[in-house]
UniProtKB/Swiss-Prot annotation:
Keywords: Chloroplast, Plastid, Ribonucleoprotein, Ribosomal protein, RNA-binding, rRNA-binding. It comes from the Eukaryota. This is Small ribosomal subunit protein uS14c. It comes from Oenothera argillicola. Binds 16S rRNA, required for the assembly of 30S particles. SUPFAM superfamilies: Glucocorticoid receptor-like (DNA-binding domain). The keyword RNA-binding applies. GO terms for cellular component: chloroplast; small ribosomal subunit. One of its GO terms (molecular function) is structural constituent of ribosome. PROSITE patterns: RIBOSOMAL_S14 (PS00527). One of its GO terms (biological process) is translation. Part of the 30S ribosomal subunit. The gene is rps14. InterPro entries: Ribosomal_uS14, Ribosomal_uS14_bac/plastid, Ribosomal_uS14_CS.
Length: 100
C-alpha cells in the first residue's frame, strides 16, 4: 500500500489541475494565435507563473483502494492484482475471467 502522504499529494495535484485548467488552456490558445514573438513571451511568462503541480502531465493515476501507481486499469481505477482479486470474488459486475 502506498504511503498516505503520496496519495494526499496526488489529490492536491488533481485539485490544482482542475483549478488552473481553463487558465492554462486559454493561455496556450493565446500563444498559438499571438502575432508577435514578444507577445508570445509575455503569455508564456503568465503560463509559467501558474503552479508547477497544476500541469496535467504531473498527474499520475493511482489505484483507489491501495494507492499503487502502476498497472492501473482506467475503467475500474484499480491496480491489476486488486482487480483480479475482486473479479474472482464476484465484486465487479460484468467482469468475467478470460479463458482461451
Amino acid at each position: 500500500m502506498a504511503r498516505k502522504g503520496l496519495i494526499q499529494r496526488e489529490k492536491k495535484r488533481e485539485k490544482l489541475e482542475q483549478k488552473y485548467r481553463l487558465i492554462r488552456r486559454s493561455s496556450k490558445k493565446e500563444i498559438s494565435t499571438a502575432p508577435s514573438l514578444s507577445e508570445k513571451w509575455k503569455i508564456h511568462g503568465k503560463l509559467q507563473s501558474s503552479p508547477r503541480n497544476s500541469a496535467p502531465t504531473r498527474l499520475h493515476r493511482r489505484c483507489f483502494s491501495t494507492g499503487r501507481p502502476r498497472a492501473n486499469y482506467r475503467d475500474f481505477r484499480l491496480s491489476g492484482h486488486i482487480l483480479r482479486e475482486m473479479v474472482h470474488a464476484c465484486l465487479l459486475p460484468g467482469a468475467t475471467r478470460s479463458s482461451w
